[in-house]
Each structure stands twice: as C-alpha cells, then as structure tokens.
C-alpha cells in the first residue's frame, strides 16, 4: 500500500502554529528542512507569530561571568498562582561569549545610514554619577541623582527630551540594596532594611503613582520562605515580572542555586531551585534579566559591523571621507555581511544540540 498516497498532508498554517511554540534554535534548524520551510520560517508572518507565542511564556535569563567568558542560561518563570511554595526547574544552556584567540573583538552597532552623530542635551541640575542602574519605562528614563543631603529621581522623557526631578523619600536612603524596578508599568524603588543575609528579610518599596503630582505609595513587607531554605547568602532584588512579582536572587553562582519570586498582592514567597547552574561556576558573578522573550528578528550580527586590531581599516587623507569612517558604505556592507555570516549569533544558537 502506498502510504504517501493515503496520508493527508498537514496544512502550512498548522505547521507554522506548531513551530511557533518551539525554541528559537529549533526553528532555526528547521529552516534547513526544505526551501519551502526556509521561506515560511523567514517570513515576517512567522516572526510575528513566534514573538506572540514567546511573549506569552517569558523566561529568566541568567548570565555568569567566568574568567573573561560569559555563559547564558534561561529557565521558565513560574506562572502564578502557585500550587506549591517551592519548585525545581532545569536551566537550558544557550551560548558562551568570550575572547577569540585571546584577542577582544568589538562589535559596533550603527544606527541609520547617514549623518550619524551624538547630540548633547543640557541637564539643568548637577549631580554625582548615580550608582544605581537607570531604567526606562514607557519612554521615560529614570535614574537617581545624588546630592550632598538629598536624593532625587531624574526623569528624562525621550520623546520630548525634557528633564523633571522628583524628591525621593528620606527613608529611601542609599545603600547597596537600593534598586529601580518596573513595577506594573510604574517606577518602583526597593531597599532591604537592616539586611545581613538569609531570611527573613524586610523589604521596602516606593511606587511612583503620579509623576506630575509627585505621588508615591509606600509598602513594607517581611519575607519568610514557607519551605526550609538552608541558605544564609545575600540575596538582592533584580527586577519584577510583568505580573508584579518581585524577583530576588543570589549574588554568586553555587549549589544550591535559588531564585525567589515575591508577590506583594498575595504576600507569598516562592523559592525556585534551578538545576544546572552553579555546579561549575563557584562564586562567580551572576547577572539576571527578567521577562526575557525570544525574538527571531534579533539577528544582530547581520546588521552589525565590527573592527578588530588584526586588519584595521585604511585611513584616508581626504577631508571628504570623514563620514566614510563613521558609516560603512554599501559596498563594504556586503563584504562585512559575508565576513560575519559564519559568526551570526542566531545561526550559532540554532546549531547547538538539544539536550
């Protein structure tokens, strides 16, 4: 019996629906199945569909810095409400970035094609450089500006290019635990009070309810894990999920490796033990990115041009070639594309074998 004649073919739209639920590296490999699949998976319809599906399942991206190399893992973020107060997840290894033959390679992102330049914007207020990392929420860049006897929240609207400064509560004194977070689309400032490691810990949070009226709402919580976590290491706030859960993590990578999700609305604390992280990276720095979403359009190496010390570009003495040094010409772009095609991040990512 001819099985091919009796078997019904799967519609292309159903194939795309199935593939949109797979990891990015898997969809990259499936481009090689056939010309038809390669065309469908590179189409803008599929990239938008994949982003929609990926946005519904955000992940926690973990980076570990070890001896000049950076290792990236990711694990699914637990969906609330939780059934248990403690769960165990496995981390997926994604990529290793580091030095090539003990020589640093720098990738320079060029925005636009002509008249690329920086513009200076005068800030009406002088301040010391902020120690806390700034955060951008809904087109407004927030940062803490520190004076001699006060702390201000600097608000820079990217669209109008205007500054606004808000006084920060004196109770929100500067310490190593102070953190700016995106709390449900609003600016949140968190600190841990009298913290000496481990649990329980006291967490304070200020939420900016109205920028124009300078209205803040203050919260205070005491975090106690319901399950027994035998760990006295320092944890700190790294961000908040889109659903409003505050994420706390350890400073260093070693077993057992925990991530904590605190829900202010339900006053619950979930501890997540992540396996596969911390076994070989004892006491190395860890970086976290909350609500990480895979996007097939993020193909940075195909639109990025790099310069290395091996073959520096030949300098021209012509005064009319200044812009040629800043922006690659179209002829050079094609050559650069061929050069970096072999080290494309997405292509390298999809060649990794599934565990």
Swiss-Prot record:
Polar residues compositional bias, start-end: 306-320
Domain annotation F-box: ranges: 4-49
Comp. bias (Basic and acidic residues): 321-333
Region (Disordered): 306-333
Coiled-coil intervals, chain numbering: none
A Pfam family per the record: F-box
InterPro entries documented for this protein: F-box-assoc_dom_typ3, F-box-assoc_interact_dom, F-box-like_dom_sf, F-box_dom
SMART domains for this protein: FBOX
Protein name: F-box protein At1g31080
Annotated organism of origin: Arabidopsis thaliana (Mouse-ear cress)
């Amino acid at each position: 019996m001819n099985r091919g004649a009796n078997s019904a073919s799967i519609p292309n739209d159903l194939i795309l629906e199935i593939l949109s639920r797979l990891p990015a590296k898997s969809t990259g490999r499936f481009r090689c199945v056939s010309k038809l699949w390669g065309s469908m998976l590179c189409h803008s319809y599929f990239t938008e569909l994949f982003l929609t599906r990926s946005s519904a399942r955000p992940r926690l991206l973990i980076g570990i810095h070890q001896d000049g190399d950076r290792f990236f893992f990711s694990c699914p973020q637990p969906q609330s409400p939780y059934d248990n107060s403690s769960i165990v997840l496995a981390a997926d290894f994604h990529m290793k970035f580091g030095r090539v033959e003990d020589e640093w390679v720098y990738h320079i992102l060029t925005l636009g094609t002509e008249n690329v330049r920086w513009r200076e914007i005068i800030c009406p207020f002088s301040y010391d450089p902020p120690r806390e990392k700034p955060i951008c929420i809904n087109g407004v860049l927030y940062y803490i500006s520190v004076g001699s006897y006060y702390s201000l929240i600097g608000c820079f609207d990217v669209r109008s290019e205007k500054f606004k400064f808000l006084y920060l509560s004196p109770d929100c004194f500067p310490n190593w635990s102070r953190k700016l977070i995106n709390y449900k689309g609003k600016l949140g400032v968190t600190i841990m009070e009298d913290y000496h490691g481990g649990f329980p810990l006291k967490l304070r949070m200020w939420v900016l309810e109205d920028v124009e009226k300078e209205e803040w709402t203050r919260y205070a919580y005491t975090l106690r894990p319901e399950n027994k976590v035998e760990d006295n290491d320092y944890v700190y706030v790294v961000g908040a999920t889109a659903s409003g859960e505050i994420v706390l993590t350890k400073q260093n990578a070693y077993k057992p490796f925990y991530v904590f999700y605190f829900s202010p609305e339900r006053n619950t604390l979930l501890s997540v033990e992540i396996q596969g992280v911390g076994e070989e990276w004892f006491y190395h720095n860890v970086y976290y990115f909350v609500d990480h979403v895979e996007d097939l359009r993020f193909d940075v190496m195909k639109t990025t041009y790099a310069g290395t010390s091996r073959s520096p570009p030949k300098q021209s003495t012509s005064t009319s070639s200044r812009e040629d040094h800043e922006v690659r010409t179209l002829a050079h772009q094609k050559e650069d594309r061929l050069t970096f095609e072999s080290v494309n991040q997405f292509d390298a990512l999809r060649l990794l074998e599934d565990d």
